[in-house]
Amino acid sequence: AGMLSFCKTPMIYTEHSTQNRRRNNILLRNIDNIIYNKCYKKVVACADKALETFNQVYPSVKHLCAINNGVNTKQYADAEPYKKQQLLGISEDCFVVTMVARFMFMKRQDTIVEAMSKLPDSFHACFVGSEPNDEGLLKVKKKAEELNVKNRIHFLYLRSDVPRILKTSDVIMMSSKYEGLSLSSIEGMAAGKPFVATDVNGLREVVQGAGVLFELNNSDELAKILMKLNSDKEYYKMISDRCKVRASLYDIQKMIDGYMNLYQKFVKL
């Protein structure tokens, strides 16, 4: 920290999460506090909630601001969908719920698997993220086998065609324990699909008033939400339309403009 504090180049740090393990360790928290105060000219949070939680943990850090993460919304809005038979080997009448995320405990993909076990056989879950031998993925796969829904759970691993996969899906969702500002939620909404997410920090702020929120780990509530989206076409369209409008607020150009304006304040012309 001492060496970095003498660096003549202004340093800017971006905080991407509302929670991390270092904050729970008093030694690491104090070290981080020194670094934030001594080394950085500005600390940028990727969302308002990330700014709020950062300020609660490091109240002495005053050089803060928030610049929302953003995505190329047009890329997702204009993507060409696959046929479900082509992508997953299932009928076009099947109702597909997709989550794009690494397989980590905090992502809680198991909640979606549990919800599938409480829904008709026409409901399928599609997971994008992580390698085939990933430990977290294997645990979720085992859960699907235990609940006898493995034929309705599709693991697509790492993909470069996520926009097309989202366009093929009926609902996009995120079942995380917490997020910073979830890009997956914005991408899902930009695809023009209803977005369903846990009512937690980092998701609530983006989804509330547009998509649908459910209680963390509550697979019963999730199953009811998915059933309603499947059976009520007017409700489905209303949520889809609201999500498209919400996604437009997080277009990547807005993020670029925010960072450019910030950097220009520290550039000596």
Predicted regions and their residues:
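Nucleotide-sugar donor phosphate/pyrophosphate-binding loop at the beta->alpha transition
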Residues: 9-10, 19-40, 52, 58
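A conserved mid-protein helix/loop that constitutes part of the nucleotide-sugar donor-binding site
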Residues: 95, 99-118, 135-139, 220-221, ...
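Conserved acidic donor-binding segment of nucleotide-sugar-dependent glycosyltransferases
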Residues: 212-219, 228-233, 248
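Short hydrophobic beta-strand element within catalytic cores of glycosyltransferases
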Residues: 194-197
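A short helix/loop element that forms part of the nucleotide-sugar donor recognition site in Leloir-type
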Residues: 76-90, 142, 235
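A short, active-site helix/loop in glycosyltransferases that binds the activated sugar's phosphate group
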Residues: 40-65, 71-75
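Aromatic "clamp/platform" in nucleotide-sugar-dependent glycosyltransferases that forms part
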Residues: 158, 177
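Short, structured helix-loop element that forms part of the nucleotide-activated donor/catalytic region
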Residues: 126-150, 235
